[in-house]
């Protein structure tokens, strides 16, 4: 290695390259930066951390087998731990979308750890004869097992955070369901008046579907716990000592905090990426459900003067550059857009997973880029949706009550008491005259005021049973 004050010269089998003297990355990282200026993004911090965990576990496992000198292995492990602790993340400069099945990410990791380990031992960066990114940091590994294992750990880390946020959002929906349990409103099917429902019942439904999504995402993690570490290049484990394979998984379990196990069949685990598509599918279903909820809230909050105006969403910002006083349902709208992105990401993940060939899927970089993005924007979206929207929703109770009283749909509750034909005539007259169902029932003498009070009671109309069933005990149709 040749070095000056500002640069050092590193070389690989393709030739020499100038590397900034202060940089912890090396020649292979710089080649990747030149080759793949694709997204303008950097590697996600969770993946950087996960890759460092992989390298620390590998170093200790290689020391366990006796193949890696303890002084070198110790410094590699310590350098990796520094990255886990959040240091040197600015040295991970390769684009997340890249050719090579993740080799650039793997080598960026190897080079940063090697150079930091060299520095810790008192050597200059780039003195790879002492500690090599390949010989030492990447010992008994291939990108094809180190990178997928890092993806598994990063995804599990991010899902853990997402699930906490989802539980908090679920609690917010449950709280609103309880708060609004007494609020009667008109239910709608086909966007037309149907029969009454309580606003709390609608929010309870939102909490229930989110509860299923939480369970679905938890279940989707099952195959992420299986890692192919020790598979090396094609799953056969060439250059990986059996003791190393056992020990590296043990160390991964300890450092990650997840119940990781070695994959039962390493060739299968190296070829196939269905573990990621399973997670992505669960995320997609969740966002389909959340987007539907966001749509509902936008409809119910439409107005404020000539829309439904059933609920009020918290005002977060002025809504127009030309219309003074306009406020838009921006927090619901952003959830819709998160859904569109996650659904699109899922399609990309499916295509990337399908594109595997023979012993390896080389499309894992774009796959993990989209998977991590989906989890990240869901976590961020749910957090602000709960804090800035759901928690502050209020109901326009008096207006909702008026809607119910004016609705023709409540004739459905009267139907069992006067018969379908009579109910149809009253419904038609209500539509034509604008009179309420209550008024017309009294005008035609089909029911008394007291009977209507029982039948049209909000709780009578929003529970499984004939509204006013007690009135039918001695009455034959």
What do these predicted ranges mean?
Residues 1-477:
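Conserved, well-structured ligand/cofactor-binding cores
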């Amino acid at each position: 290695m040749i070095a000056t004050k500002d640069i050092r010269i590193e070389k690989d089998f393709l030739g020499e390259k100038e590397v900034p003297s202060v940089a912890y990355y090396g020649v292979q990282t710089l080649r990747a930066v030149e080759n793949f200026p694709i997204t303008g993004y950097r590697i996600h911090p969770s993946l950087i951390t996960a890759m460092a965990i992989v390298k620390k576990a590998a170093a200790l496992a290689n020391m366990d087998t006796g193949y890696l000198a303890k002084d070198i292995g110790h410094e590699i492990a310590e350098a990796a731990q520094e990255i886990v602790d959040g240091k040197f993340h600015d040295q991970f400069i390769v684009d997340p979308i890249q050719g090579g099945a993740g080799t650039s990410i793997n080598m960026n990791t190897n080079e940063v750890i090697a150079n930091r380990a060299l520095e810790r031992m008192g050597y200059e960066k780039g003195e790879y004869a002492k500690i090599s990114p390949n010989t030492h940091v990447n010992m008994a590994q291939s990108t094809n097992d180190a990178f997928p294992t890092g993806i598994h750990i990063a995804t599990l880390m991010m899902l853990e955070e997402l699930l906490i946020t989802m539980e908090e959002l679920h609690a917010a929906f449950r709280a609103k369901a309880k708060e609004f349990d007494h609020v009667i409103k008109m239910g709608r099917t086909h966007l037309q008046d149907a029969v009454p429902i309580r606003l709390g019942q609608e929010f309870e439904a939102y909490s229930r579907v989110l509860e299923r999504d939480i369970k679905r995402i938890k279940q989707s993690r099952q195959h992420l716990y299986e890692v192919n570490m020790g598979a090396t290049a094609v799953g056969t484990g060439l250059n990986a000592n059996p003791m190393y394979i056992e020990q590296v998984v043990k160390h991964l379990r300890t450092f990650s905090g997840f119940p990781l196990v070695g994959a039962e069949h390493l060739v299968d685990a190296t070829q196939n990426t269905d573990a990621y598509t399973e997670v992505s599918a669960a995320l997609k279903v969740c966002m389909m459900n959340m987007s539907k909820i966001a749509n509902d809230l936008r409809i119910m909050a439409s107005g404020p003067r000539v829309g439904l105006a059933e609920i009020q969403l918290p005002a977060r910002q002025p809504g127009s550059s030309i219309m003074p006083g306009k406020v838009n349902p921006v927090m619901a709208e952003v959830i819709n857009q998160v859904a569109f992105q996650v659904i699109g990401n899922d399609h990309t993940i499916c295509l990337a997973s399908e594109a595997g060939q023979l012993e390896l899927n080389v499309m894992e970089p774009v796959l993990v880029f989209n998977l991590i993005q989906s989890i990240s924007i869901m976590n961020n979206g749910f957090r602000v949706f709960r804090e800035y929207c759901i928690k502050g929703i209020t109901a326009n109770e008096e207006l909702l009550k008026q809607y119910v009283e004016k609705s023709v749909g409540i004739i459905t509750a009267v139907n069992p008491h006067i018969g379908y034909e009579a109910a149809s005539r009253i419904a038609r007259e209500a539509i034509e005259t604008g009179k309420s169902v209550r008024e017309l029932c009294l005008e035609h003498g089909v029911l008394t005021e007291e009977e209507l009070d029982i039948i049209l009671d909000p709780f009578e109309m929003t529970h499984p049973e004939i509204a006013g069933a007690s009135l039918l005990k001695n009455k034959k149709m």
